[in-house]
Amino acid sequence: MLKVIEYDGNLKEIAQKLNNRKEEISIEVNNAVNDIINDIRKNGNQALINYCRKFDGYQIKDENDFVVSNQEKEEALKQVDQDYIRILERTKQQITEFHKNQIDKSWSLYKDNGVIMGQMVRPIERVALYVPGGTAAYPSTVLMNAIPAKLAGVKDLVIITPVKADGKVNPVIVAAAKVSGVDTIYKFGGAQGVAAIANGTETIEKVDKIVGPGNIFVATAKKLSYGVVDIDMVAGPSEVLVIADENANPKYIAADLMSQAEHDKLASAMLVTTSKELAEKVNVELKRQMAYLSRKEIIEESLQNYGGAILVKDLKEAFEVSNYLAPEHLEVLVEKPVNTLPYIKNAGSIFLGEYSPEPLGDYMSGTNHVLPTGGTAKFYSALGVYDFVKYSSYSYYPKDVLETFKDDVQTFAKSEGLDAHANSIAVRFEEE
């Protein structure tokens, strides 16, 4: 179970181990994805059709089969239970309530001398949301990405998702798209899907940004497409860090640690506590609860390789550990947890108290579950409305005000060897 480690002020080894969990992008994968991107750029629709047939087994006839038709949507929605639709709608309300507070506004500054300056906030025009295919469906991914984009004002939001050989998109993905207000769903994914939507083809309009999770080929395609389009982030394996005092409930802690460990064998679940007795009780609970969970083997390997219980002398040290590791998810199970917020510097998303478990955040708390991993919470943020807008500054200067700056600007420009810059100012004050 969790290996108990006494904190001695040195976390470099632990941090390095956690941050190295990302799958290395091998030369082979990189080259393969590069070839796919170049093929799509050169051969467009036909290359995409070939890859759909090769990788997904979807015997697509022509480019008309790229998009989920209205009839296909109607048939898919009939397969989704109405109570599930209710849950999606409730989740949408929660996400909207939180994220609407992130909406930024344009502003202007009018000075007495006639100068006008300001900043315009404008939505990104066209965005693609990648939704993983396969046996598992992730409608929460649709909601978490689409709703902030819609609140930002993105008018053209599309989904790309791989399909099986039958060419069908999972019905719950169709339902989530409808609830989120996404009308266009493309039936392709993988590196080829990213390449097609990033570069465009004869019938597919290129986007300005791609968001959403995917496998190593999707992640590589997104990285290689950055600059042609914007991307959200390239996330690594999931992680949770729980800070707990001696009064925390070991049953809850064990359950929350396993909720992350079940994602995959590279997931990390760490406990930081002031109580060795609590750590021991958590290990007992892990064994007990794990016995009846379907992903027991994955959980066990994850906890063994990337789990641990770090013993600290006080909560000050606990937050020192947490801020250094900068976890994707941080749970704080101590007395008066809300009062600890000033001590938290680096965390993707924070869950305060015993009744705010991380899985609530995965689905329905309203906060976003697209989060920085691998220590990148030190400089990255959770996905939000701000990821779907751009900022343009503007300025208006009357001639008489420019004249008060002309000598200084020319001197500055010449000091950098940019005579044409200086000339641009000078010509405006030459006598005709």
Predicted regions and their residues:
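Short internal beta-strands
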Residues: 155-164, 269-275, 353
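Conserved NAD(P)+-binding/catalytic subdomain of aldehyde/semialdehyde dehydrogenases
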Residues: 181-252, 256-259, 263-268
